């Protein structure tokens, strides 16, 4: 092999020689092949070449998918059975139709903790995401997907129909760590995954592996950190054929290390059934691994090598491998496409090996007989030893033909896709080659007995920005489309563009294997599927390279997008314009030019213009001051598309002269009309019948110019809350004790009685109050001043014991005596001690520790009529002296009246009006300030209240119809009261102060009425101090005839008669309740129904 070897010390001085030789090799005459064909070298295609299709024209039939939230469309998996394509992108999986319509989107991103860990290890934020790099179908409905996952590869099992995750697996050794790493993988139906990738974080440990898709499966790999096996390999692709799996890669050539670093393209092969070595020899390593160099070069005395493989595709039906190659980075850019028969690849693996015994030794050719392990046969220890020695084949794999199928200078080929199409007469392979500048070259390759013919059919501009990077390219036969995955979008481009050829000659001369002329419709079209139409569809008898020197009729490109353009001689006016060019294809060699316009203009700026003035209108009236008008419109032309509107007025007015004055018109009267009724007021009573009111105003309209007032009433009343009120009962206070037997002398034994009454009412009306039967209590009083309620004694005949000594000598003590089971107590030595404020523990307060308070009186009226004031209530100690009870006898409470500001500015309220027929009375006041401030004249001007319904009528009726009955009942009641008063007043009412204090009660009380566990009052009376609320009984004068039975008990309780006020309350009585005798607190009860009358 002839090689140009440059010694390192002379490299810079002889670099110019290398450049000259490279140019001579690329541009010199090409040798002929044995078949008589010559390989066409690439030509510089300009945009006026008939084979060039611009991005604008390409997108007219293409489909582009773009998602602003997604980038890096690196993987595609076609699922023909379900008419869908699975797309892997950054953090996302898509399920789409073949026309790139999204069917489902599944997010699959790395967790925040994984991203943080990735950045902590030194990686950039851009790459610390989950980039999908592996997509494989497994079984009938399973998808196996793997992603970089922020440099922590992860895999997942999903369903093909809805991308639902069914399982998760580690992606280490199955998926690369870095998104830009060159890797390849192949999944067999038995679940064995063959992978060529970097297996560590740094990307330095590159290997070819076999592992299972299930977890914890044993894997085989190339020997680690051994350059004879793999030396910095960059994987391009892989395919399976027969018992073998083949990997295409480029790596540093270990056999050329002594002369400097060189990149060679390789094909590596392993057996599918390789079980690996045993013991310490090739344990977990391949025993069938071999690799050979791929030769793609231009022949000559100094062959021009394209050493770096970039893309590959395998035609399984033809057993042909296609690959794209580039020159090394240190030489002039050049690219080529080479094809290899599988038989040529296997022949190289059947040849001798190239071995280097040690690092300083020269490489030599070696043959060995123990090769069964390389043919997927059985192996032994001896075979393992041979496998550990030999990996590199001595002979390179030679391409089909003596030179590349297609090559070009100053271009860089990348990925490769293949379609095999049957024309009307023969079979043609169509290659889609990605080139620099985001161009796609469509090449036709035809094999026959004489050799290979490769032709450039079309050149596509796949992107007009020049910023996107092609990540994946694949061809789908079902849709006859090429799919491009870039870092920005996903694009589907139809393989044929027949409609751009407008004549039969142009169609046939294009030599596009997808196109033919349909004479029925006279159009260039793809091959029809209907056999009856196929006979009218014509192609060239033989597909050759396009005829470039024949007349080519021009064809219009697609319209450009609408854009702003400027009108001629009007710098402030713009239009919307779009253009097309006659370059799809451009007419050449006398071909017909395009027919039609090349520019379209619309939506031009149009400034407004006035129309002519209209005729003057009639005067607005026939007398007085009037005007007439004329009009014009801005419609000649109307402003449009940003044009200026007309300047000036669209209406002109002029006074009408010489019109007679108009007579003065009398204003028309307007009768008043009622407005809507207002809301109903609150009811005047909660039960027993009340009234509520609503009002309306005569303001809809208000009477004007002498119009009539509104008929009817301004106010409206109705009854409310007609349900009956619940009857309320209350007890009156006990009357004072009245002497009923004896001579009236308090020093003699006598009997006393007292009474209380029950009042019932069903409404607040005083006339509804009814008085029930009285309740009475009796007690026996002795000559010593003590009294005792009547009770049966077991020892009635036993004499009372003497009084015990007084408990204290001063300050008030207690004496007790016992008779039978009863006992009595009285106060003694009540005169003050020398130091009364410091009573000892034997004082009256400690002796009478069970002194009880009476009930509180009613609250007094508030001390003020507006603002904040006080109200008071009092109570008396039932033991006879306030000092004998714990607590306060007076209690005060704050009370709040209406704010005093409400009276500012107002006059005094008027008297209440008479009751209306609706039972309502009113009063009013007026504001004394003409312009009141915010604090003056606040509140209502009128105030209303409800009267007792039909009070006057009932009173009149009672005074006439029932007068005899009232007189009779009054006389009968007076006679009864006189008889009772005669019996009660036989004894003197009042006692001296000392006797009152010494008067005690017995511990056991009895009543001459029925037994009752409640007693309204204690059985001891005190008269040392009169309360504020006096009993209605007064001390009888000696001249009083009360004891003679001349007293009168009436409703009004006239004091001059010295008769009790039945409903009056004493200071020891409760409003409505009783005191439980056995209760230590003497609680007041409100349920008077428990009093058994």
Swiss-Prot record:
Keyword DNA repair: no
One Gene Ontology term of the molecular function aspect: semaphorin receptor binding
Region (Disordered): 1018-1056
Keywords for the protein's UniProt record, in alphabetical order: Cell membrane, Differentiation, Disulfide bond, Endosome, Glycoprotein, Membrane, Neurogenesis, Repeat, Signal, Transmembrane, Transmembrane helix
InterPro entries tied to this protein: Plexin_repeat, PSI, Sema5C_Sema, Semap_dom, Semap_dom_sf, Semaphorin, TSP1_rpt, TSP1_rpt_sf
Residues annotated as domain Sema: 50-495
Function: Regulates the motility of migrating epithelial cells by providing guidance cues within the migratory environment and may also play a role in development of the olfactory system. May act as a positive axonal guidance cue. Function in neurons is essential for adult survival and is important for climbing behavior. Promotes collective migration of follicular epithelial cells in egg chambers, likely by acting at the leading edge of the basal epithelium cells to provide guidance cues across the cell boundary to the trailing edge of the cell ahead.
Protein name (record): Semaphorin 5c
Segment forming the signal sequence: 1-34
Gene Ontology biological-process entries: axon guidance; central complex development; embryonic development via the syncytial blastoderm; olfactory behavior; positive regulation of cell migration; semaphorin-plexin signaling pathway
Glycosylation sites: 48, 162, 182, 285, 295, 341, 603, 745, 998, 1046
Ranges of biased composition (kind: Low complexity): 1041-1053
Tissue specificity remark: In egg chambers, high levels of expression in the follicle cells, with little to no expression in the germ cells (at protein level). In stage 3 to 7 egg chambers, planar polarized at the basal epithelial surface (at protein level).
PSI domain boundaries: 497-546
Description of the deletion phenotype: Adults display a slight decrease in olfactory avoidance behavior towards the repellent odorant benzaldehyde. Also, the ellipsoid body in the brains of many mutants are decreased in size. No visible effects on development and mutants are viable. RNAi-mediated knockdown in the neurons of adult males significantly reduces survival to 37 percent. Adult survival begins to decrease from approximately day 9 post eclosion. Pan-neuronal or glutamatergic neuron-specific RNAi-mediated knockdown decreases adult climbing behavior.
Species this protein is from: Drosophila melanogaster (Fruit fly)
Disulfide bridge positions per record: 118-128, 146-155, 271-376, 296-338, 619-656, 623-662, 634-646, 683-720, 687-725, 698-710, 862-895, 866-900, 877-885
Membrane disposition: Single-pass membrane protein
């Amino acid at each position: 092999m002839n090689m140009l070897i440059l010694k390192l010390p002379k490299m810079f001085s002889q670099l110019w020689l290398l450049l000259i030789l490279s140019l001579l090799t690329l541009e010199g005459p090409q040798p002929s092949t044995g078949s008589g064909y010559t390989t066409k070298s690439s030509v510089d295609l300009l945009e006026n070449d008939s084979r060039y299709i611009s991005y604008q024209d390409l997108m007219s039939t293409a489909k582009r998918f773009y998602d602003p939230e997604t980038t890096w469309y690196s993987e595609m998996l076609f699922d023909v059975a379900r008419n869908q394509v699975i797309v892997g992108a950054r953090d996302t999986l898509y399920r789409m139709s073949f026309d790139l319509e999204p069917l489902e989107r599944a997010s699959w991103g790395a967790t925040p903790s994984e991203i943080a860990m990735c950045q902590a290890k030194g990686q950039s934020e851009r790459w610390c995401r989950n980039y999908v790099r592996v997509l494989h179908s497994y079984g009938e409905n399973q998808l196996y997907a793997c992603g970089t996952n922020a440099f922590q590869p992860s895999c997942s099992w999903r369903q093909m129909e809805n991308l639902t995750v069914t399982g998760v697996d580690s992606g280490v050794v199955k998926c690369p760590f870095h998104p830009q790493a060159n890797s390849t993988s192949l999944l067999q139906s038995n679940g064995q995954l063959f992978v060529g990738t970097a297996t560590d974080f740094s990307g330095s440990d590159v290997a070819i592996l076999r592992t299972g898709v299930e977890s914890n499966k044993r894997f085989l790999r190339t020997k680690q950190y051994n350059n004879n096996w793999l030396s910095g390999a960059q994987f391009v692709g892989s395919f399976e054929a027969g018992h073998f799996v083949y990997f295409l890669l480029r790596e540093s050539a270990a056999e050329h290390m002594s002369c400097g670093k060189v990149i060679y393209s390789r094909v590596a092969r392993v057996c599918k059934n390789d079980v690996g070595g045993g013991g310490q020899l090739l344990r977990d390593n391949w025993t069938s691994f071999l690799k050979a160099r791929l030769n793609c070069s231009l022949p000559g005395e100094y062959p021009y090598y394209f050493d770096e493989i970039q893309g590959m595709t395998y035609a399984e039906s033809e057993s042909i491998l296609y690959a794209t190659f580039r020159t090394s980075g240190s030489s002039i850019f050049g690219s080529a496409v080479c094809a290899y028969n599988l038989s040529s690849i296997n022949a190289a693996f059947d040849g001798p090996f190239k071995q280097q015994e040690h690092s300083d030794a020269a490489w030599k050719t070696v043959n060995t007989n123990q090769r069964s392990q390389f043919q997927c046969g059985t192996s032994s220890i001896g075979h393992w030893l041979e496998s550990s020695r030999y990996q590199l084949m001595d002979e390179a794999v030679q391409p089909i033909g003596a030179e590349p199928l297609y090559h070009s200078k100053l271009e860089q080929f990348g990925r490769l896709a293949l379609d095999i199409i049957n024309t009307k007469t023969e079979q043609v392979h169509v290659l889609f080659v990605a080139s620099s500048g985001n161009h796609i070259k469509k090449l036709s390759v035809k094999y026959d007995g004489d050799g290979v013919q490769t032709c450039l059919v079309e050149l596509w501009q796949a992107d007009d920005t020049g910023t996107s990077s092609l990540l994946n390219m694949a061809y789908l036969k079902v849709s006859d489309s090429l799919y491009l995955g870039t870092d920005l979008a996903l694009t589907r481009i139809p393989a044929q563009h027949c409609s751009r050829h407008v004549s039969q000659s142009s169609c046939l001369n294009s030599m596009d294997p997808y196109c033919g002329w349909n004479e029925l419709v006279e159009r260039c079209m793809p091959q029809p599927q209907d056999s009856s139409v196929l006979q009218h569809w014509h192609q060239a008898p033989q597909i050759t390279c396009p005829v470039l020197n024949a007349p080519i009729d021009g064809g219009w490109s697609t319209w450009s997008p609408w854009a702003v353009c400027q009108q001629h001689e009007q710098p402030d006016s713009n239009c919307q314009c779009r253009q097309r060019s006659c370059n799809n294809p451009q007419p050449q060699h006398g071909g017909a030019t395009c027919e039609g316009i090349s520019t379209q203009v619309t939506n031009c700026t149009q400034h407004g213009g006035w129309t002519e003035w209209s005729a003057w209108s009639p005067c607005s009236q026939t007398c007085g001051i009037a005007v007439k008008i004329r009009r014009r419109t801005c419609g000649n032309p109307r402003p449009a598309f940003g044009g200026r509107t007309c300047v000036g007025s669209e209406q002109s007015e002029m006074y009408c002269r010489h019109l007679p004055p108009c007579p003065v018109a009398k204003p028309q009267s307007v009768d008043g009309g009622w407005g809507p009724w207002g809301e109903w007021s609150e009811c005047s009573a909660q039960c027993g019948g009340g009234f509520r009111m609503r009002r309306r105003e005569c303001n809809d309209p208000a009477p004007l110019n002498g119009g009539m007032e509104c008929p009817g009433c301004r106010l409206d009343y109705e009854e409310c809350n007609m349900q009956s009120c619940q009857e309320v009962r209350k007890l009156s206070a006990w009357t004072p004790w009245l002497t009923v037997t004896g001579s009236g002398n308090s020093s003699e034994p006598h009997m006393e009685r007292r009474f209380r009454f029950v009042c019932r009412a069903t409404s607040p009306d005083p006339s509804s109050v009814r008085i029930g039967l009285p309740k009475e209590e009796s007690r026996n009083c002795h000559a010593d001043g003590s009294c005792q309620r009547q009770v049966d004694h077991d020892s009635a005949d036993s004499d009372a014991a003497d009084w015990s000594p007084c408990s204290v000598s001063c300050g008030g003590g207690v004496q007790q005596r016992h008779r039978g089971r009863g006992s009595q107590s009285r106060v003694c030595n009540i005169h003050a001690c020398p130091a009364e404020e410091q009573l000892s523990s034997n004082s009256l307060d400690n002796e009478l520790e069970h002194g009880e308070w009476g009930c509180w009186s009613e609250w007094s009226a508030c001390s003020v009529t507006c603002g904040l004031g006080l109200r008071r209530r009092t109570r008396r100690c039932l033991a006879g002296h306030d000092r004998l009870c714990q607590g306060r006898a007076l209690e005060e409470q704050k009370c709040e009246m209406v704010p005093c500001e409400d009276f500012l500015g107002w006059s005094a309220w008027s008297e209440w009006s008479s009751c209306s027929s609706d039972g309502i009375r009113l009063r009013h006041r007026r504001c004394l300030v003409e312009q009141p401030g915010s604090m003056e004249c606040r509140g209502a001007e009128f105030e209303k209240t409800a009267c007792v319904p039909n009070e006057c009528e009932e009173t009149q009726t009672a005074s006439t119809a029932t007068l005899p009955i009232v007189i009779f009942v009054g006389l009968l009641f007076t006679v009864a009261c006189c008889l009772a008063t005669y019996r009660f007043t036989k004894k003197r009412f009042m006692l001296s102060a000392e006797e009152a204090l010494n008067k005690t009660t017995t511990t056991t009380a009895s009543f001459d009425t029925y037994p009752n566990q409640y007693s309204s009052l204690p059985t001891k009376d005190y008269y040392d101090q009169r309360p504020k609320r006096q009993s209605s009984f007064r001390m009888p004068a000696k001249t009083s005839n009360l004891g003679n039975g001349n007293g009168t008990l009436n409703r009004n309780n006239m004091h001059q008669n010295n008769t009790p006020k039945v409903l009056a309350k004493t200071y020891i009585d409760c409003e409505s309740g009783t005191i439980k005798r056995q209760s230590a607190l003497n609680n007041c009860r409100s349920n008077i129904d428990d009093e058994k009358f």
